[in-house]
Amino acid sequence: DQIQWAEKEYNNSKFNLPSPFNKVISQLPEWVSKPYEEIAENFLKDLGIFDTHVALITAFGLSVLDKNESVDRCRTLPSHYTLTHYLSGKDPDVFYHPAKDLLSIVNPDLDEWASAKSLYINEGDVIIHPSYLEYSTPQVERRRVTITLLFNIERIPA
């Protein structure tokens, strides 16, 4: 399954990459990528654009964070969307409000716009978010393994 594949990739490359482990995968077995293709198709259906658009996967990555490791604020541009599959570990990412600073200038006392939020996640959860959204991963309490897929939505030529 995907967890065994991820552990094998990690064990084969962990001494060749800096910590925290983040590897771009160029050759992916079809059985690993197929579920993500289906999720991307369902995302297009949810948006109501499945008949006119296609999701083009532009990058695929594997991240392994060991206890007390973290990831600084980042975003995954220039892709349109980022899909994260939490294979193991329950430590969530923190997502930052893209216009918080601007809103604070206009109305500094407005508390309803939090600058950052995290989602409650379980192992196996998949989330999709716009790639312009900054996120980080605070120190994890135990090993966390995620697969990240970047994709663009393109109109199907008529």
Regions found by a protein language model. Give the residues of each.
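Catalytic core of non-heme Fe(II) oxygenases with the double-stranded beta-helix
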Residues: 61-128, 138, 156
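A short coil-to-beta-strand element that immediately follows conserved catalytic motifs
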Residues: 48-60, 95
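Residue-level preference for beta-strand/loop junctions
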Residues: 56, 77-79, 143
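Non-heme Fe(II)/2-oxoglutarate
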Residues: 1-53, 68-70
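Asparagine-centered strand-capping/turn motif at beta-strand->loop junctions
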Residues: 135, 139-141
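A short hydrophobic beta-strand segment most commonly corresponding to one strand
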Residues: 83-84, 142-157
